[in-house]
Amino acid sequence: MSTDLIIDGFVLGHSTVGGDDATEAILSMYEKLDRPDISFLLISGIVISLYNIVDVKKISEKIGLPVIGVTYEDSKGIEDAIKHHFPKSYDSKLAEYSKLGTREKITLRTSYDLYIRNEGCTVSEATHLLDKLTLQGSVPEPLRISQLLANTLLKAKF
């Protein structure tokens, strides 16, 4: 979706539940798009598919664009949950998670709070972009449309 909110394409991908391939899956989707006009990447959630951690810094460095990971609620962290679900291999997941750093709380012009991790842009630039892309509520339009499409595909019976 472009910043003028025109939908101009989709790409689909997947990552392994409980795996370590979310970052590579996102990079693969970016490459499949083959679009030179992309100017930023938004990701809804940085820890997806049962603790499959997205490395926003690596993605930003590889594609040379700003990457903004968006979450909608404050949390106390997931360290204990990672230890619980991965008792024999939690060290590597915790190391990957700690590399993400802390989230920044921002308030949109809609008065909703978001929590972001940003690479390749400042918090101020990320806030400006998210304000522009959020028409109502807390979910920026590109992420809202992506979630609608994903939910529809999950429910579809071909």
Language-model features: where?
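N-terminal, Lys/Arg-enriched amphipathic/low-complexity engagement segments
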Residues: 1-19
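Loop/helix-junction capping segments adjacent to catalytic residues or to phosphate/diphosphate-binding pockets
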Residues: 20, 49-53, 76
